Amino acid sequence: MKPQNLHFDYGLVEAILVPFIRNEIRKFGFGSVVLGLSGGIDSAVVCELAVRALGVENVLALMMPYKTSSQESLDHAELMVDRLGIRYEIMPVTEVVDAFFATRPDASRLRRGNVMARSRMLCLYDVSARDGCLVLGTSNKTELMLGYGTMFGDMASAVNPIGDLYKTQIFGLARHLGIPAPLIDKPPSADLWEGQSDEADLGFSYEEVDQLLYMMLEERMDRDAILAEGIDSAFYQRVRSMVVRNQYKRMMPVIAKLSSRTPGIDFRYARDWQEVR
């Protein structure tokens, strides 16, 4: 597959996502948002879009470092705060995470990373309740398809404007929006431990997997057609298995249908009951 198939008109993407954020937030009766600002490119893009949609006064960024978080991540988050002039709060999660694992000293890195992500979710949703705002999500399409994230952690949000953009496309949108170069140029990382990087964890690059996912999803190509494009068979099978295995992460909890109107199945339009004022 030719790489340009992943390219978008990013001016058009901005023109769609800015009113999307504004409309989705306001239709539920809210006017402001809170999001985790990690110093990475995904949260930077979402923060930029949110300010353009809602105004600087209606966006609150939380920085939630753990003791092993890199100083560079904090510096890059502050770079976005200074660029946009938004309000921010620093809420370290070290004490919460360490207290949880005080009686679980043999916990794996994966378990620790999940608890870090869910501790940050707690902070975001507590601020959401405190301030009467909605949590804005920062998970991209690549992460969602691969299940590369923590359910009820970094994947938790009320509205996710970038969930249909592959990581490769996030980079393109970031350049269009004028996100500072240091955030774009550094290797993507969840910063869960020192030296951690997304692509090292996954075992392949975002460019490689995005092109494969594009063939599988957008082009709906079958295995034989994909392998004919030169994709390695083992790579194809691994990615396909990740997509299938992590379907549950992309869904709300499945409800057994017993009545004529079931939440999430037949009953989906509560906003039709809202009074028009």
Swiss-Prot record:
Keywords, alphabetical: ATP-binding, Ligase, Magnesium, Metal-binding, NAD, Nucleotide-binding
Q: In which pathway does it act?
A: Cofactor biosynthesis; NAD(+) biosynthesis; NAD(+) from deamido-NAD(+) (ammonia route): step 1/1
List residues binding Mg(2+): D42, E143
GO BP annotation list:
NAD biosynthetic process
- The EC number(s) attached to this protein equal 6.3.1.5
> What's a single GO CC term here?
cytoplasm
Tell me the Pfam families matching this sequence. NAD_synthase
User: Which Gene Ontology MF annotations are present?
Assistant: ATP binding; glutaminase activity; metal ion binding; NAD+ synthase (glutamine-hydrolyzing) activity; NAD+ synthase activity
List positions binding ATP.
G36, L37, S38, G39, G40, I41, D42, S43, T138, K167, S189
SUPFAM superfamilies given for it?
Answer: Adenine nucleotide alpha hydrolases-like
What family does this belong to?
Answer: Belongs to the NAD synthetase family.
PANTHER family, per the entry: GLUTAMINE-DEPENDENT NAD(+) SYNTHETASE (PTHR23090:SF9), NH 3 /GLUTAMINE-DEPENDENT NAD + SYNTHETASE (PTHR23090)
Per UniProt, subunit arrangement is:
Homodimer.
Record-given protein name: NH(3)-dependent NAD(+) synthetase
Organism of this sequence: Chlorobaculum tepidum (strain ATCC 49652 / DSM 12025 / NBRC 103806 / TLS)
